[in-house]
């Protein structure tokens, strides 16, 4: 839905045939109210060795660099450790089969999307995730993990921002 939401056709992940379904668009420390971003760091641009750790996790390395600057700098981790954490978090979450590679647009309720993720992920419950939408379209699925990334955890700050629409469009994979 990122690709359908605006002028993003020039992004690698939005090219026809890129075959990206759900992708990581961030991992950040979450406070009970809000989150830190753009923290002071001696490393603004991750070294090439760290960028290799980001390959295959983010849809493109430009997004990986951006996410490091915005959120990774607040993680208390080195760029390589941050990207390894992102990979661990991504590997923790199973994308439901019906949403993994949709070939045609679907209409679903946010609750059905939430249920699909809960069914696919042992230990995930309502209150530990939120389906976000914008202008009637799925925007993202936000899932909260413990600090050590081993368990799902409640996150009222995130769930308060969940989509309230009855039905939303889920775009196909490009």
PLM-predicted stretches and their roles:
Residues 9-174:
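Domain-level detector of nuclease and nuclease-like folds
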